[in-house]
């Protein structure tokens, strides 16, 4: 059953979920259908833009890899194959009902305000759980590891919900996605550090501020043209190649926000229906709809910094001690890795870029450390790409929640108790903080 659900893909499954949620919240059925399908149209459009980005940026990325002389032997296979690997494991087979029931239990007990409908991305929790299982040899510890990751993700979603809503321009949503949520503590820490630096304190340099100060220089189209030119020159392209990249990157800068607007347009009646429903039946209790990080990609800072990080990532990969991962399949979608930095830093370009470099260092190192386990998962799952190189990994598995949970639980029963205790403490602390606000 769950295999069939996953086979529908996000562009079909998410709209169906949205229609069902709309009907639960007493939205007229035709309006619920239109809302769900509109969300689906937005995701289809965004998928097309992502495919265009991958098709256009992959060739110059490969040229840059050759020019930088990268000789790394752990290959990044990307988030798509990684999700398949996650769901092909023993924990992946049970992850949807386990995490869904956890979410419902936390909602009922008021330990979270988020209902995570982004079920497709439960694979992040499956990867964490399976790494724990491979480290410890215990399926039970693995399931506990996945539950810990999911619980932390839900609380990070609650914690950042208002900032996400401000960036996206839509009330009643949050981001519990397994990777995005795991980057939140680091970005919050870095934001506090930036506030201690004199020339960064109290300043917010986003695309709108640049446009206000320097006119058309801050326009997304112009930013896209400049970034495309940088890509072309870095890849040694001639006039034709540079011109093509300039137009393509400018298109990405413009089309991503347009697709996000479609998703937001579809979510508006559902969000409004949810608000009215909970005001009427639950005395105004606030509940968020948990979505994929994709809904944050419309911000110019996320797109611009994400694209800038592509050549930076290749340089980092070549000089970072301990890194063995060759960034490849996940590289064209680099904006996904720093979308929560944009949220935490309120769209500030400089802060988001610095934080992006720092978080990608952690991503490379964790992806390197997880490579043996990820390769073993892929081989056991019968994935053919696992036999094409000595080891494989994915940048998208390099998240800090997965790493910290697996490291603790690898210590055995004491580590498991400590990990569960820390997660429970974080959940209760953030809940107490919410009640005091």
From Swiss-Prot:
It is a multi-pass membrane protein. The chain crosses the membrane at residues 5-25, 35-55, 88-108, 134-154, 173-193, 215-235, 236-256, 302-322, 325-345, 354-374, 385-405, 410-430. PROSITE patterns: PTS_EIIC_TYPE_2. It comes from the Bacteria. GO terms for cellular component: plasma membrane; transmembrane transporter complex. Keywords: Cell inner membrane, Cell membrane, Membrane, Phosphotransferase system, Sugar transport, Transmembrane, Transmembrane helix, Transport. This is Putative permease IIC component. It comes from Escherichia coli (strain K12).
């Amino acid at each position: 059953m769950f295999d069939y659900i996953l086979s529908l893909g996000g562009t079909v499954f998410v709209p169906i979920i949205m229609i069902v949620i709309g009907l639960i919240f007493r939205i007229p059925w035709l309006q619920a259908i239109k809302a769900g399908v509109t969300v689906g149209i937005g995701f289809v459009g965004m998928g097309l833009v992502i495919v265009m980005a991958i098709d256009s940026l992959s060739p110059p990325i490969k040229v840059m890899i050759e020019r930088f002389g990268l000789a790394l032997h752990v290959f990044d296979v990307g988030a798509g194959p990684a999700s398949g690997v996650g769901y092909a494991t023993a924990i992946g087979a049970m992850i949807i009902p386990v995490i869904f029931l956890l979410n419902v239990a936390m909602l009922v007990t008021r330990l979270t305000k988020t209902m995570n409908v982004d079920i497709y991305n439960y694979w992040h929790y499956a990867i964490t759980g399976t790494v724990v299982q491979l480290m410890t040899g215990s399926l039970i510890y693995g399931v506990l590891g996945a539950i810990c990751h999911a619980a932390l993700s839900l609380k990070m979603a609650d914690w950042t919900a208002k900032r996400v809503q401000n960036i996206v321009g839509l009330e009643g949503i949050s981001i519990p996605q397994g990777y995005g949520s795991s980057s939140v503590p680091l970005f919050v820490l870095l934001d506090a550090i930036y506030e201690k630096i004199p020339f960064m304190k109290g300043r917010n340099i986003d695309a709108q501020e640049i446009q206000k100060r320097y006119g058309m220089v801050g326009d997304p189209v112009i930013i896209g043209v400049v970034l495309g030119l940088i890509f072309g020159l870095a890849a040694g392209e001639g006039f034709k190649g540079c011109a093509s990249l300039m137009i393509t990157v400018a298109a990405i800068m413009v089309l991503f926000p347009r697709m996000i607007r479609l998703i937001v347009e579809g979510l508006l009646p559902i969000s409004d229906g949810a608000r009215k429903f909970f005001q009427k039946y639950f005395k105004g209790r606030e509940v968020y709809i948990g979505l994929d990080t994709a809904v944050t990609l419309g911000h110019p800072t996320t797109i611009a910094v994400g694209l800038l990080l592509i050549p930076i990532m290749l340089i980092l990969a070549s000089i970072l001690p301990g890194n063995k991962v060759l960034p490849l399949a996940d590289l064209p979608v680099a904006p996904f890795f720093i979308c929560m930095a944009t949220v935490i830093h309120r769209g500030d370009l400089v802060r988001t870029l610095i934080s992006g470099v720092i978080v990608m260092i952690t991503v490379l190192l964790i992806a390197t450390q997880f490579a043996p386990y990820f390769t073993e998962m892929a081989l056991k799952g019968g994935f053919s790409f696992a036999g094409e190189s000595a080891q494989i990994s994915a940048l998208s598995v390099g998240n800090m929640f997965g790493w910290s949970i697996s490291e603790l639980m690898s210590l055995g029963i004491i580590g498991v108790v400590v990990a569960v205790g820390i997660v429970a403490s974080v959940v209760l602390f953030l809940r107490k903080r919410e009640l005091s606000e």
